[in-house]
Amino acid sequence: MATYVKTANKGEVRVLFSVPKRYFRKAVDRNRYKRLLRESYRLNKETVTTAITDKDFGLDIALTATSNQKPTFRRIETVMIAILKGIIYEEDN
């Protein structure tokens, strides 16, 4: 699940990763999920940062895990790409 808010910081994108204890009881599993989320964002952040650089606002994005299935990098990356493209699409229109 992704939530974002426009901020006054021009062209700045900040991201929050959250994995609730409700879905993953062990800290090892939560940390792995967050690590995969961070890596996926790192590899795909260029799409959102290039779209926001010339705008007069910034974005704060919160990504929260809402599934209790064990994550795979491929699944997380496809969802991450879809989320980032969706945010860009909503802000352009």
Label each region the model flagged.
Residues 1-93:
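Positively charged, solvent-exposed patches that mediate nucleic-acid binding
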